[in-house]
């Protein structure tokens, strides 16, 4: 979810009539805060225990594109020895979210890669609304799951690029259980300046040269940033009454409150001090599974009430 007015920073909570879900969106405005950021717990339920992250691929994704995102999801958990992720790692970054559970009765969820669902026939068409995203999310597990809908670069989704790069929400309670869901779109052809910064020049603000993406794909590396933000939002505010700042209709969550911040010294138009791969020249801040490198957003550390970057 770019520079001062195009990098992502607020959240939006909307209620769909049919599904009654709470949706938080990674929007397109940047926010670099110097003041303390307090995430208030609103006493709602949190995810707990073992949670499968199921990936629903809508439209055409190449095998290498799917591998980048699949490996990112696998990176969220700390692998057993002898193959730990080099530090700074995606797993260590994700552990910052665990601090939100310190005073909760819930046990911090253990995320694991679940099933893959492929829809390369565009069964719902190439223009999707909120209800369509929910229908797609329902193709994953009905309970103890985060069902992630990933739309290809030729799929138009209501609000995509204009106000958001991704959303998260939850299904209503049912006998089958309840699942959380995430949607993220590939911005490669529609809005890389909004939803793939700093790997593409922003639409607005300072026009610094874009950074080189670590996986060689501007759109998919941008999707990883949005997916990371939305998964943390799902873990800390799954049902709209968890941890957030501000009004429930437009909450700021652990990642979206730090939009546009990826390294120390970040300011609007500058992502911050990042690691650079000497072989490829790619910029990143976290190591992942299978030797992958990723860019993940800063998170609000509840112990310091400030945006915390990796490393």
Curated annotation (Swiss-Prot):
- Predominantly, its location class is secreted
The secretion signal range is 1-24
Q: Which residues are glycosylated?
A: 60
- GO cellular component assignments: apoplast
Keywords (A to Z) from UniProt = Apoplast, Glycoprotein, Secreted, Signal
| Location(s) in or outside the cell | Secreted; Secreted, Extracellular space; Secreted, Extracellular space, Apoplast
Source domain of life: Eukaryota
Q: In which tissues is it expressed?
A: Expressed in leaf sheaths and nodes.
Q: What does this protein do?
A: Involved in the control of organ size. Upon auxin signaling, is targeted by the transcription activator SMOS1 to regulate cell expansion during organ size control. May promote cell expansion by modulating microtubule organization.
Q: Which family does it belong to?
A: Belongs to the EXORDIUM family.
Q: What else is known?
A: Plants silencing PHI-1 exhibit partial dwarfism due to decreased cell size, increased cell number, and abnormal cell arrangement and microtubule orientation.
Protein name, UniProt field: Protein PHOSPHATE-INDUCED 1 homolog
Q: Which organism is it from?
A: Oryza sativa subsp. japonica (Rice)
**Gene encoding it?**
PHI-1
């Amino acid at each position: 979810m770019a520079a001062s007015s195009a990098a992502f920073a607020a959240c939006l909570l909307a209620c769909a009539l049919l599904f009654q879900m709470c949706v938080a969106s990674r929007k397109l405005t940047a926010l670099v805060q110097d003041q303390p950021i307090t995430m208030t717990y609103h006493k709602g339920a949190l995810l707990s225990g073992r949670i499968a992250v199921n990936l629903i691929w809508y439209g055409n994704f190449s095998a290498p594109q799917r591998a980048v995102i699949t490996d990112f999801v696998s990176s969220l958990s700390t692998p057993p020895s002898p193959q730990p992720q080099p530090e700074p790692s995606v797993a260590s970054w994700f552990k910052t979210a665990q601090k939100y559970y310190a005073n909760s009765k819930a046990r911090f969820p253990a995320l694991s890669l679940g099933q893959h669902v492929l829809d390369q026939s565009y069964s719902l068409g190439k223009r999707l609304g909120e209800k369509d995203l929910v229908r797609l999310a329902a193709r994953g597990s009905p309970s103890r799951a985060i069902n992630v809908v990933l739309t290809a670069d030729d799929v138009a989704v209501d609000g995509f690029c204009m106000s958001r790069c991704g959303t998260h929400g939850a299904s209503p309670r049912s006998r089958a259980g309840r699942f959380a869901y995430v949607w993220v779109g590939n911005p490669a052809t529609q809005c890389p300046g909004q939803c793939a910064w700093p790997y593409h020049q922003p639409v607005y603000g300072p026009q610094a040269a874009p950074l080189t993406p670590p996986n060689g794909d501007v759109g998919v590396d941008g999707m990883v940033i949005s997916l990371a933000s939305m998964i943390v939002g799902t873990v800390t505010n799954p049902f709209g009454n968890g941890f957030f700042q501000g009004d429930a209709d437009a909450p700021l969550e652990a990642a979206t409150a730090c939009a546009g911040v990826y390294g120390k010294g970040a300011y609007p138009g500058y992502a911050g001090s990042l690691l650079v791969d000497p072989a490829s020249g790619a910029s990143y801040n976290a190591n992942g599974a299978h030797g992958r490198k990723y860019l993940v957003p800063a998170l609000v550390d509840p112990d310091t009430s400030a945006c915390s970057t990796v490393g």
